[in-house]
């Protein structure tokens, strides 16, 4: 877990020219490459906030102390919100239960996982596909079964229509080898649920995520996924945009990773908000190119900016 001093953005003295960036507007605990006027105009347009979860509103099983206040702020401003996660290890129902346990009530419509996005992608692009070989947890596999798919076994004669590789905390060596076998068959579409190398955790361990599993498969059979569904692919935000009848610039994507959360927003034409409560450090944020539209200490500091913009 990355720890930050309470006033990191305002008290840390950094020579931005070291990073060859244009000077950034500094407002309390926020930073932006935009002027304050343009920043507030962009925030004033926001009608919906898509929230990453791990590293953004909680870490592992611990809710950040400011999360409730931030969500209350959105409600008071009339801004709707949803939860997006690249972590496919749990079904969307499991995530709703976890949020409820943490004191956050959310509906089915507010939860969108990379598993659900993968299901939507397969239905759209491979409507005849029914049989899948998946690297994924039992909870994720149930999500696909409920959607009408059949999961193939670890048998070379049980040929799938599509290979789906996900973050799998129940991974066995045999199934990794079988997934690699199917990936070596170029006529079988190969889909990855998300690009993350590791999953954030508050435990003393590194959780190897989907991107790392795909790299292992690539090392063995020289094939990469045909498509990676989760963030930074903009499809998840496009679905939210279309379902809610919004324009892309009326949505903010808020998360702790530049290469997934912020990149998703930029790819979708939405406002990209980086929070420093998870994976990304201030130094990494300053060195990134392009810059996040907003870099905030945490979601509550972003909420204060929204209040200012909507007042």
Region spans (language model):
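Asp-based, Mg2+/Mn2+-dependent phosphohydrolase catalytic module
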Residues: 4, 8-53, 59-79, 88-112, ...
């Amino acid at each position: 877990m990355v720890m930050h001093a309470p006033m990191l953005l305002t008290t840390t003295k950094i020579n931005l020219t070291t990073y060859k960036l244009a000077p950034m507007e500094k407002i309390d605990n926020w930073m932006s490459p935009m002027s304050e006027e343009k920043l507030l105009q962009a925030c004033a347009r926001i009608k919906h906030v898509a929230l990453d979860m791990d590293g953004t509103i909680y870490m592992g099983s611990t809710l950040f102390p400011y999360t409730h206040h931030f969500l209350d702020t959105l409600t008071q401003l009339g801004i709707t919100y949803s939860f997006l996660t690249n972590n496919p290890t749990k079904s969307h129902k499991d995530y709703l239960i976890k949020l409820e346990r943490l004191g956050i009530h959310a509906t089915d419509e507010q939860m969108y996982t990379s598993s659900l996005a993968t299901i939507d992608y397969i239905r759209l692009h491979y409507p005849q596909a029914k049989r899948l070989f998946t690297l994924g947890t039992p909870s994720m596999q149930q999500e696909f079964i409920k959607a009408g798919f059949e999961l193939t076994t670890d048998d070379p004669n049980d040929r799938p229509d599509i290979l789906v590789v996900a973050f799998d905390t129940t991974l066995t060596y045999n199934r990794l080898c079988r997934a690699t076998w199917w990936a070596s068959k170029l006529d079988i579409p190969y889909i990855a649920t998300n690009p993350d190398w590791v999953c954030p955790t508050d435990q003393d361990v590194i959780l190897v995520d989907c991107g790392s599993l795909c790299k292992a498969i690539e090392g063995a059979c020289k094939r990469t996924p045909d498509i990676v569904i989760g963030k930074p692919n903009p499809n998840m935000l496009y679905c939210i945009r279309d379902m809610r009848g919004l324009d892309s610039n009326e949505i903010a994507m808020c998360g702790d990773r530049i290469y997934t959360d912020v990149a998703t927003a930029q790819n979708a034409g939405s406002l990209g908000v980086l929070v420093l409560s998870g994976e990304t450090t201030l130094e990494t944020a300053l060195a990134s190119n392009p810059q996040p539209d907003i870099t905030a200490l945490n979601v509550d500091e972003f909420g204060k900016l929204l209040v200012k913009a909507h007042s």
